[in-house]
């Protein structure tokens, strides 16, 4: 029997995961509309050298210096990939692939050189440690909360504020970049600012959920919103809610199945995407097939009625023969479906 009663520790894990998913989902909409969702992948893998350099410079594994190093590396990844795309004539996907693979390999080499005897595991960057978030606590207004909630919630509030503040500008840049340039908007500044926010969000979520889940939470909830919605405002709301629902389902599922929360969150978001693709009222496969079948049956029924009418006008009424041909045709139509 499934026990859905969650402990306070489980609620804290869910809270951290939900804030991380919502923060990623807000920016994921902007990246999906620009067809650059894999930028989060590049940043998530490319920050490893920054983490190592932050450790080497500070001499400790304190959160702040390593986050600063990772943030600098993430901004460098986004700017370098954008520069290659704009000025070197390199395809956007190829530029991201070159940048993040090179920097991730560099990070592995730096770990082997400078941190071989230190418990600095690249796997923690990939998979996070959201299950251990309640271990490290800080005080908020007299309440004890997970330490990793501070950067994650900060990233969520920052992304929410930026989305509200630059709503019209980002919307124009996403749907009509040529008009945005012609309107004398600071197009490059707005796009670079978006990349910086992606970098900040990725770094803020690393300790909690790892780079793999950052990639999933940037791309999948926004894609769900894109499938279900025709307006950008609705897409942002649906994307954020899809991320939060994925966090809830992932946490509960991981507890019940005794597996990792980040992986279960990614699986949950993938399941929601499959459900959206199948059942979306406007674009879903099942509603589309139902509409096609309904229209086909309507056309065929009208043809049967027309044929019956013509037969009744051209020959004396013979109920057996006149109804036989249309009826047999109708059953043949059903047999094809």
Per-segment meaning from a language model:
Residues 29-120, 225-237, 252-264:
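Short loop segments and helix-boundary regions at transmembrane helix junctions
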Residues 14-19, 64-72, 94-98, 149-154, ...:
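Hydrophobic alpha-helical transmembrane segments
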Residues 1-22:
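Membrane-interfacial amphipathic/re-entrant helices at transmembrane-helix boundaries
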Residues 22, 45-46, 101-102, 189-200, ...:
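Hydrophobic alpha-helical segments embedded in the membrane of multi-pass proteins
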Residues 168-169, 279-290:
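Membrane-interface capping segments at transmembrane-helix boundaries
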């Amino acid at each position: 029997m499934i026990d859905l009663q969650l402990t306070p520790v489980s609620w804290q894990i869910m809270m951290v995961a939900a804030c991380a998913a919502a923060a990623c989902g807000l920016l994921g909409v902007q990246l999906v509309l620009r067809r650059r969702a894999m930028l989060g992948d590049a940043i998530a893998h490319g920050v490893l050298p920054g983490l190592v350099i932050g450790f080497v410079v500070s001499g400790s594994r304190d959160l702040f210096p390593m986050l600063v190093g990772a943030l600098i590396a993430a901004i460098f990844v986004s700017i370098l990939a954008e520069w290659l795309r704009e000025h070197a004539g390199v395809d956007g996907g190829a530029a991201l692939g070159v940048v993040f693979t090179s920097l991730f390999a560099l990070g592995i080499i730096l770990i082997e050189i400078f941190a071989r005897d230190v418990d600095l595991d690249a796997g923690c960057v990939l998979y996070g440690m959201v299950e251990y978030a309640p271990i490290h606590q800080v005080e908020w207004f007299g309440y004890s909360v997970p330490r990793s909630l501070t950067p994650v919630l900060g990233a969520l509030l920052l992304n929410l504020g930026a989305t509200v503040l630059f709503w019209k500008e980002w919307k124009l840049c996403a749907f009509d970049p040529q008009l945005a340039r012609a309107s004398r908007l600071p197009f490059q500044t707005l796009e670079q600012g978006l990349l910086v926010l992606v970098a900040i969000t990725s770094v803020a979520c690393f300790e909690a959920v790892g780079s793999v889940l950052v990639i999933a939470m940037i791309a999948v909830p926004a894609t769900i919103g894109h499938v279900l919605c025709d307006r950008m405002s609705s897409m942002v709301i649906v994307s954020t809610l899809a991320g939060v629902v994925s966090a809830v389902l992932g946490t509960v599922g991981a507890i019940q199945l005794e597996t990792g929360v980040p992986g279960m969150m990614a699986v949950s978001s993938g399941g929601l995407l499959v459900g959206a693709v199948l059942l979306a009222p406007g674009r879903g496969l099942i509603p589309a097939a139902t509409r096609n079948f309904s229209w086909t049956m309507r056309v065929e029924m009208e043809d049967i009625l027309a044929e019956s009418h013509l037969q009744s006008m051209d020959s004396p009424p013979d109920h057996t023969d006149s109804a036989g041909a249309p009826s047999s045709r109708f059953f043949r139509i059903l047999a094809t479906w």
